[in-house]
Swiss-Prot record:
Domain notes: The Q motif is unique to and characteristic of the DEAD box family of RNA helicases and controls ATP binding and hydrolysis.
A GO BP entry: rRNA processing
One Pfam family this sequence matches: Helicase_C
Listed name of the protein: ATP-dependent RNA helicase mak5
Gene name tied to this protein: mak5
DEAD box (motif): residue ranges: 350-353
Lineage: Eukaryota, Fungi, Dikarya, Ascomycota, Pezizomycotina
Biased composition (Basic and acidic residues): 1-10, 71-89, 112-136, 144-161
Length: 757
């Protein structure tokens, strides 16, 4: 009873059995040393990692090596790492479609596999079925889409066939043959037949003055600095010689029957804005598409688009056009791209005064320094002492510089209290010295071509000024737009917030307004420009923009430019006003000036029109608006401003509330909006009046907003009555027949005298 049961002693065999059981799942790691393909780390075929051309803050990550096609095996016991080469996949010599019949071994193997997989579902088959079903759905959608597209095309073709008369078929062919224009005026420039054919198809009968003056010296290999007024055709002045060099290179390549090598760009064109870069690519691309035998590939490098895609496009590009920021990002992050770009034959800097101005476009200076660096293999840091000795003293490329303003004095702020210099236009000597310090020209003295030395403004541009109170700018802007109902108008402001507010205000007043500023996404910016410039768009469309649209944009049909804010610098005014009166057309430019902006506007007139002092023409004419019109439309603008200010204030309060709520959650504290409001109400100081107005505007109820919208809608449904008796229509100077036909200005009911410049 008291004896304890003795436990059987376990011999070493039992421990061995346990070890065997535990070792079963790790047989692969225990016997990995016996596997074939395991090699030492130093025996692998390591490859050096290719670093970008310019890598900042590398932190010692130089000399990195990589290996492909190797499996890493880690032992469970001691954690030792071993490397095993992947076995190459055996290529199946027999085709999958070949059938060899059934065999006994195959049946036995298939039976065993079916028994093993009977209990467990095959996940790969399920995935394959799901994938097949998705592909089938995609194919069905694609087929349906193609069918609808074919039906539409057939319908369009049938409509076109119905509209064509049988007797006009040969006349249509003759019109296509006679499509080109007479380009005999271009023959003196020494252009090739291919380029002349493209110019003929584009209907450019005569070259502009800047094209006549600049194309021959560029074809002769000279460095050129071109100064011409806005809208004078500077793009083709450098685009045509680049395409001529492309054709010459193409002919020499075909004559020598040289082997095909990787494409090297022949030209780099830098522009300050994305919109201007897109426009340059469009204009040069039109010449390429119309000229027979010219197949130059253009790479457009601007922000807002895929960086990897632009790097791929750059590998086979002949002409590279872009903004400095994205061009430098692509070049510095790529492999061998800087070395490739050093072989370019043309460096074009459009709007050079903006790109080379102090404190702006740091990337432009980086690009210029990288293009001139001649170090074998690597590009050392710019801070090194030997960097000055490594710059190429004379570049082998042509440098072409174009702008409408080169005077550094024009970039001085007009409203500043600092020393104000005279308004004399920059002389040729001063411009040359300024650019020679910034750029590495091939020649000691590049050719300076000033087509219009007397005035920087277009000849057919009419300039005016409207004086008003600071709080009445919205009212006078709306009145000016009513005076020009069928004019495509461009409104410039000095801030992004003003663009957003004015766009909403004009849209509330039922005017077709679009916005353009630098904070917009790239696709939205392109969409706004496309809608504004489309021939099918409303002829009275309005584009409210910052100075991002001031340079280079060539939009046909802009008749009217309004400066809602006086420009900060004189060169900004020159480029803003240059959006109209382009290529010999007429245009108007009006500044809405408040009393605090008057000093800057007076300085502006003195700077821009310095050489017109002895002429009878007044540079900026004072325009008087009809006070009857201003008083009648004041109620409209007041209601629209209250609606817009209320919406903006509510959006601002909502965004601030969301930010404070998120910050409180991150800190782990309770958020009480009333407590924050009470604390803000106790504060004093600058900005309290504005905050109080925003709070009052944001507290407007939905019912009040609906009432204001209804009242505004009723006012907008009627014309502005300027002294017409609604009971006795035949009295006064009203032309009833013209009103019934819809002639004249449909915004007014009565006779309104147009603005006289």
């Amino acid at each position: 009873m008291g004896q304890k049961r003795q436990r059987d002693q376990k011999g070493p065999g039992s421990f061995a059995k346990k070890r065997k059981k535990s070792a079963k799942p790790s047989d692969a790691t225990a016997e990995d040393s016996d596997w074939d393909g395991i090699v030492g780390m130093n025996e692998l075929n390591w490859k050096e990692v290719a670093l970008p051309d310019r890598l900042e803050d590398a932190g010692g990550f130089f000399g990195l090596e990589e290996i492909e096609g190797v499996d890493i095996i880690r032992s469970e016991g001691n954690g030792e790492i071993k490397f095993k080469k992947k076995e190459p996949e055996e290529t199946n010599t027999q085709s999958d479609d070949e059938w060899e019949g059934f065999g006994d071994d195959d049946q036995a193997v298939s039976q065993e596999e079916s028994k093993e997989t009977q209990d467990e579902p095959n996940e790969s088959d399920k995935k394959a079925k799901v994938k097949e079903s998705k592909n089938a759905k995609k194919e069905k959608k694609k087929n349906a889409k193609d069918a609808r597209k074919e039906q539409k095309e057939k319908a369009v073709e049938s409509k076109e066939d119905k509209g064509i008369k049988s007797g006009l078929s040969f006349a249509a062919l003759q019109e296509e043959e006679d499509d080109g224009a007479d380009v005999s005026a271009w023959e003196s420039l020494g252009l090739s037949p291919e380029i002349l054919a493209g110019i003929s198809k584009m209907k450019f009968t005569t070259p502009t003055s800047v094209q006549k003056a600049c194309i021959p010296p560029i074809l002769d290999g000279r460095d050129v600095i071109g100064k011409a007024s806005t809208g004078s055709g500077k793009t083709l002045a450098f685009g045509i010689p680049i395409l001529e060099y492309y054709l010459e290179k193409l002919r020499s390549k075909t004559q020598k029957d040289s082997e095909k090598t990787e494409t090297t760009p022949i030209a780099l064109v830098l522009s300050p804005t994305r919109e201007l870069a897109h426009q340059l690519a469009k204009h040069i691309g039109e010449v390429v598409s119309h000229a027979p035998g010219v197949n130059a590939r253009i790479a457009l490098l601007t922000g807002g688009l895929s960086l990897q895609k632009q790097q791929r496009v750059l590998t086979n590009a002949d002409i590279v056009i872009g903004t400095p920021g994205r061009v430098w990002e692509v070049l510095s992050s790529g492999h061998g791209l800087i070395r490739k770009m050093q072989a370019i034959k043309f460096l074009v800097i459009d709007e050079a005064d903006r790109l080379l101005s102090e404190g702006h476009f740091k990337e432009a200076h980086e690009i210029l320094a990288a293009l001139d660096r001649v170090v074998d293999g690597e590009f050392p840091d710019e801070s090194s002492d030997e960097s000055d000795d490594e710059l190429d003293p004379k570049s082998g490329r042509q440098t072409l510089v174009f702008s409408a303003t080169f005077h550094r004095d024009l970039q001085q702020k007009l409203a500043g209290k600092g020393k104000w210099t005279g308004g004399d236009i920059m002389s040729q000597k001063e411009s040359m010295e300024y650019l020679l310090q910034k750029l590495n020209f091939r020649e000691e003295k590049p050719r300076f071509i000033d087509v219009n030395p007397v005035s920087q403004m277009a000849e057919n541009l009419k300039e005016g000024i409207v004086e008003c109170a600071a709080m009445e700018k919205d009212l006078f802007l709306y009145t000016l737009l009513l005076y020009h109902p069928k004019h495509r108008t461009l409104v410039f402001t000095n801030s992004i917030s003003a663009v957003r507010r004015l766009t909403q205000l004009l849209q509330t007043l039922q005017l077709p307004a679009l916005a353009l500023h630098s904070s917009m996404a790239q696709k939205a910016r392109l969409r706004s420009v496309e809608r504004f410039s489309s021939p099918s768009s409303d002829p009275s469309s309005i584009l409210v923009a910052t100075d991002v649209a001031a340079r280079g944009l060539d939009i046909k049909g802009i008749d009217f430019v309004v400066h809602y804010h006086a420009p900060r610098t004189a060169d900004a005014y020159v480029h803003r006003s240059g959006r109209t009166a382009r290529a010999g057309a007429s245009g108007k430019s009006v500044i809405i000036c408040s009393p605090d902006e008057m000093v800057g506007v007076v300085r502006l007139a003195a700077k821009v029109h310095a050489n017109m002092a002895n002429r009878k023409k007044v540079p900026l004419e004072s325009l008087e608006l009809d006070r009857r019109v201003v008083s009648r439309v004041k109620q409209r603008v007041t209601l629209a401003a209250r609606i817009v200010d209320s919406n903006i204030a509510k959006e601002k309060v909502s965004s601030e509330d969301n930010w404070l709520r998120t910050a409180a959650e991150d800190l782990g504290v309770d958020y009480d909006s009333e407590e924050f409001d009470n604390a803000a109400a106790r504060g004093r100081g600058r900005g309290r009046g504005r905050q109080e107005r925003e709070r009052k505007a944001g507290s407007t109820s939905k019912g009040e907003l609906a009432g204001m919208r209804a009242e505004l809608k009723q006012l907008l449904s009627q014309r502005v009555n300027v002294g017409v008796s609604e009971r006795y229509l035949t009295s006064g100077r009203v032309d009833i027949e013209a009103l019934l036909r819809g002639e004249g200005n449909n915004s007014f009911l009565g006779q309104v005298d147009p603005l006289d410049f």
